[in-house]
Each structure stands twice: as C-alpha cells, then as structure tokens.
Design a protein with these regions (language model features):
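Unchanged
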Residues: 80-81, 90-93, 124-216
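Acidic, metal-coordinating catalytic segment for phosphate/diphosphate chemistry
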Residues: 50-95, 99-100
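Short loop segments at secondary-structure junctions
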Residues: 72-74, 98-101, 110, 179-184, ...
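Alpha-helical and coiled-coil interaction segments, frequently adjacent to or embedded
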Residues: 2-8, 17-61
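Charged, long alpha-helical assembly modules
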Residues: 205-206, 212-232
Length: 232
C-alpha cells in the first residue's frame, strides 16, 4: 500500500504547481493585453467563432479548408478574418533507443517539403481508433520491422503533443522516446510509393547528422537532456 503521506505530499505539490502556472498565465496575459489592437484574446467567455468553412482541396494526405472566423472584439463586437487550414490526421514521432546496445534508430527518405533525402525518425499517421502507443508500435513495425517482445519489451517516454505548424495546419504530433529492452526483427511493410532507409547509430552519430524536421529535433533534444541528467 502506498504511503498516504507521500501521496498527499505529491498531490499538494501538483496542486501548488498548477496554481503557480495559472498565476503566471494571468500575469503574461495582462502584459500581452497592453499591445492589443482591439481583439479580445484572453476572454474566458468569448471565443473565436467559425462562420463558414469550405473544403477547397482533398488529397491523399491532407485536405484544405477555406474558413471565415469571427474574432471577439471590445464592446461585444467582432472582427471577421479569413484563414486556410490543412486538415491532417494526428501523427506519432518516435526516437527509438536500443538500451542493451545504446543505439538509436535513424531513417532517411525523400521529403518533398524540404526537397531533401532527409535524416529523420520513424513517424506516421494515426489510424482511427488507435491510441498513441498502438500507432507508434504499428508504424515502427511497418517502417523498420522492429517489434518489442513481451509486455515489458518497451518503455515509453512521452515527450508531449505539439502542433507542427498551428498557423496553417491542425496536425498534432505525438512525440515520444521508445526505450527497447527486448525486441525482434520482422519484414518491413511499405506502401508502394514509400522508400525508407533505416540504421542503428550511436548517440554521437545521431547528434552529428543534420536532422531538420522540428518534431524529430524535439525528441532528440529531450533525450539529450535525459542523458545529461543520468550522468549527474
């Protein structure tokens, strides 16, 4: 049975931390309000309202919506703006670590956005009904053939969920580090137009190649901090 005093202390610390964060948010909101041009951005009662939306493009990976949105202004008024947004399924991004060998899984493939054969990490879209860990395990198996063995074959270190580019897309990237304790290799399964290379590299090699995808950089920087902390 857990120590009640320890649990109470942890709960109190969490409450205090949440209260402090809320207080900081209020302070920052007050500072930002000084530069307002009339749009009410920190109202708890009034939010942006979607007036209309039209799908103007449908593709294999994303759709594009043209939207008219009413932003709340002072005196109960509103200001209408027009925005386009890429509708994109949420995705998973995984930094995969083989604990026994202290090696990391690096990929290389063509990325049209950067027009590069880019270094990166295993990643992919979540299917309907999947949770984050299910999607990560499926994508890892499909892209690399790496499959954890047993319930304790992998430890997930969830870094967080971040928008890839919130000014133009609703894609939410769920970033994590997967620490493999036991795993086996199986045949990879690619879509016909997927061409991906993968290799196990040392931490020095991983940190030394030019990874340019922001979500991958977040995962690598998180792991860098964890490695530093473990040495202390």
């Amino acid at each position: 049975m857990p120590d009640r005093s320890t649990a109470d202390t942890a709960g109190t610390a969490e409450t205090v931390g949440t209260a402090a964060a809320s207080d900081i948010t209020r302070q920052v909101d007050a500072l930002l309000d000084r530069s307002t041009d009339g749009i009410v951005m920190d109202s708890r009662d009034r939010r942006a309202v979607v007036l209309s939306r039209q799908t103007v493009y449908q593709g294999a990976v994303f759709d594009v919506e043209d939207m008219r949105i009413a932003l709340p202004a002072g005196g109960g008024d509103s200001v209408t703006v027009r925005r386009q947004v890429c509708r994109h399924a949420p995705c998973v991004v995984m930094l995969v670590h083989d604990e026994a060998r202290d090696l990391y899984l690096l990929e290389r493939e063509y990325r049209v956005g950067s027009d590069l054969f880019a270094y990166g990490l295993p990643a992919g879209l979540m299917d309907d009904g999947e949770d984050v860990e299910q999607a990560a395990l499926r994508e890892l198996a499909e892209e690399t053939g790496v499959v954890p063995v047993g319930q304790d074959g992998v430890i997930f270190d969830h870094v967080g969920a971040f928008y890839s580019s919130e000014g133009m897309s609703d894609e939410l990237a769920n970033i994590m580090v997967m620490h493999l304790r036991r795993w086996e290799s199986r045949p990879r399964r690619f879509d016909p137009d997927e061409h991906v290379e993968s290799a196990w590299v040392t931490w020095r090699q991983l940190a030394g190649v030019p990874v340019t995808a922001s979500n991958s950089v977040i995962a690598i920087q998180h792991e860098k901090i964890q490695r530093i902390l473990k040495k202390q």
